Amino acid sequence: MKLVFFTLLISVFSLSVYAEPRVIQSPDHKVNILELYTSQGCSSCPPAEQWLNSLKTEEGLWTTFVPINFHVDYWDYIGWKDPFASASFSKRQRLYKHLKFARNVATPGFILNGKGWNGWFYGQSPSWVNESPSGDILATLNGQSIEVAFTPKPQGREHLQSGALKVHIAILGFDITTKVTGGENEGRDLSHDFVGSTLFQREYYFINRIINRLLCQRKQKGKTEKKSREKDRQS
């Protein structure tokens, strides 16, 4: 899971379409990944999403931390089908519990740097870590394709050499409003930011340096921007 989580640092890269190729280098520190698992069919979720939305104005956005809003599909049967829900996002949340990095599968549910985080429920702010990365990521954007190169740092080689790396690239939606006409949030206008609308992932085995090409297709829901993207109830 450490390897999978590490590669989420690709999320700091912009995937907008440029006329000329653009090269983007990962920073010299790990970027914190804050995942929210939510659903438009969950009456307890809007406050958590409102808080996540407020991070748009936080200092360090994209350089210190990256929020991602994953809508799960396991509440789609209770009166409202979430248009942003994906079975792959539900599977991703269940994987955290299966690997014992989270205690349960619930909405709203937070994962911070690969582990369950309940601080929001107690009015706490996340504690961003400031650590050296295991390697450098170089992304070259050319039209709708992206070439990703990873070079491990000396201190990162030991635990990376024996396994596979997964590259995760998500397209996030912003300034999205949905009028809900059924389910627990019936009659409410829900606002969303950092919404994971598409998640690409590829797995590669690595010897010393990785270079791979990925095709990223634009998917527009509301005003979108390109950045990097299981049934218990907590409500």
Named regions from a protein language model:
Residues 5-14:
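Bacterial N-terminal signal peptides
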